[in-house]
């Protein structure tokens, strides 16, 4: 017997949304901006990496970000993650500090979080593109409608998911998560401006694993390999 989770994919839950005029307008806007010579992050091929690397049926944990990193070579389509060889930005450094304090895992020399994504951690930004050097420059081009739909589709997921909502922006999305099978953990944002107000010490990584264990879903190995293949 196949379960609903096995029969559903991002394509089946988001296919109709991608046919909506607004979605094509987003893609057209980004294309025109690039054509006009503006630098847009992440590269075109990486925009939907979060959905490519973490299949719908495999999602166990969701970490929400606001928009992609806006510096050179940083963003590659996974919230908070940076490409191999790029120094971890301050928020990610604080994530690693908390991970070390919580689970004792060593702080990696890189900030490439693909290993998490491949285990079922959806690293989703609310806006999927940004203009170089201009944070939140694409916050109002329609991405939020699409990524809200992603969250709503996860609310309908047949298995329990742990949502890690860091900062007031991410926490507003909790109104989209109404299904009682899911669990929500909230903390301040890991940015240097707010990490000391409760992100550091939140122990969300061990708590997420405990909740996954209780739901019979299998825990996440949060430790990152020292070498990135």
UniProtKB/Swiss-Prot annotation:
Listed InterPro entries: UDG_fam1, Ura-DNA_Glyclase_AS, Uracil-DNA_glycosylase-like, Uracil-DNA_glycosylase-like_sf
Enzyme class name: hydrolase
Acyltransferase found in the keyword field: no
Catalytic activity: Hydrolyzes single-stranded DNA or mismatched double-stranded DNA and polynucleotides, releasing free uracil
GO cellular component, one term: cytoplasm
Keyword terms of this UniProt record: Cytoplasm, DNA damage, DNA repair, Hydrolase
Any GO MF annotation of the entry: uracil DNA N-glycosylase activity
One Pfam family in the UniProt entry: UDG
Assigned EC number: 3.2.2.27
Active site: 67 (proton acceptor)
GO BP field: base-excision repair, AP site formation via deaminated base removal
Main localization of the protein described in the UniProt heading: cytoplasm
Subcellular location: Cytoplasm
HAMAP family named among the record's database cross-references: UDG
Family: Belongs to the uracil-DNA glycosylase (UDG) superfamily. UNG family.
Job description of the protein: Excises uracil residues from the DNA which can arise as a result of misincorporation of dUMP residues by DNA polymerase or due to deamination of cytosine.
Protein name per its UniProtKB record: Uracil-DNA glycosylase
Organism encoding this protein: Coxiella burnetii (strain CbuK_Q154)
Lineage: Bacteria, Pseudomonadati, Pseudomonadota, Gammaproteobacteria, Legionellales
Name of the encoding gene: ung
């Amino acid at each position: 017997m196949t379960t609903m989770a096995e029969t559903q994919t991002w394509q089946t839950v988001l296919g109709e949304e991608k046919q909506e005029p607004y979605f094509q307008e987003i893609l057209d806007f980004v294309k025109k901006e690039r054509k006009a010579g503006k630098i847009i992050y992440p590269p075109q091929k990486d925009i939907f990496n979060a959905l490519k690397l973490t299949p719908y049926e495999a999602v166990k944990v969701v970490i929400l970000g606001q928009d992609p990193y806006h510096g050179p070579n940083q963003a590659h389509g996974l919230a908070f993650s940076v490409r191999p060889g790029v120094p971890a930005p301050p928020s990610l450094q604080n994530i690693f500090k908390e991970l070390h304090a919580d689970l004792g895992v060593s702080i990696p020399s890189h900030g490439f979080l693909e290993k998490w994504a491949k285990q079922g951690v959806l690293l989703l930004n609310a806006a999927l593109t940004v203009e170089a050097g201009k944070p939140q420059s694409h916050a109002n081009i329609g991405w939020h409608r699409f990524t809200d739909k992603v969250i709503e589709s996860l609310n309908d997921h047949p298995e329990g998911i742990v949502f890690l909502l860091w900062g007031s922006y991410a926490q507003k999305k909790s109104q989209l998560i109404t299904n009682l099978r899911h669990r929500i953990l909230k903390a301040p944002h890991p940015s240097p401006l707010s990490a000391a107000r409760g992100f550091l010490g939140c122990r969300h990584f061990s708590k997420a694993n405990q909740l996954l264990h209780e739901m019979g879903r299998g825990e996440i190995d949060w430790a990152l390999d020292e070498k990135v293949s």
